[in-house]
Amino acid sequence: MDASSLFSIKGKIALVTGGGRGVGEMIAAGFVANGAKVYISSRDAAACEATAAALTAQGPGSCVAIPGDLSKYDDCIALAKEIESREGKLDILVNNSGATWGASLEEYPDAAWNKLLTLNVQRVFTLTQALLPALEKGAAASGSPSRVINVGSVNGIDVPVLPTFAYSASKAALHHLTRHLAGHVGKSITVNALALGPFRSKMMKATLDAFEDALAQSLPMKRIGRPEDVAAAAIWLSGPGGEWVTGTIVPVDGGATVYGEAKL
């Protein structure tokens, strides 16, 4: 029962969507550093390829870019087929692709709802559904469940102060979808979500540029999330030590859900 075996993901095949930068890159980097073969996909092909090359150079695992627009149904299906064609199975799926949209209540556009609910919820379902055969083959080959990790948000748990109406609603929906999926995939696949607090990413840039010091001081941990914080949580859920955890929403937030003033 040593830690190195409980949290080993060496040799695992993983797919991290939105893996070209931000939180997705943080998770992919953690996987590669611990010996996994990681596929990353995002709409920004240049960022995707650059990240894959950099992570492979760091090793000891490897990283492969498969660019695609994961807001589109056809691109999700094509990505799933490409993974099956290359590997025949999948051990870990991290659904991280997402977007946000902020505007006042009076000016909040209808387009925000279409964009965010499609990318943040519907396409998570689309891709997970399309990859079920590969995930089931991964479980059969390893003798342990394959893992699905959905990247949610503390905004899906507590009501945020900022006017990100469609975003917070989409993350609450994603958390509920996580639990619903976990109840349907049985013992061959676990499904969990990470409800993230503030991390340095493109999505959080404007907020952190304006409020980083105040936000950090409002958290019990008095700092913004670091790459190793989210990578460690994903590795835990992906390794043998996380095998009996499913249908759970795990806050990785420095205590953001504890204090009301820490809400974004």
Q: How would you label these PLM feature ranges?
A:
Residues 94, 186-190, 245-247:
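Short, small/polar-rich loop/turn modules that mediate ligand/substrate recognition or access, typified
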Residues 133, 182-187, 243:
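Alpha-helical segment proximal to the catalytic Tyr-Lys
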Residues 13, 18-22, 44:
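Conserved glycine-rich cofactor-binding loop
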Residues 104-105, 109-117, 215:
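Substrate-binding pocket helix/loop in short-chain dehydrogenase/reductase
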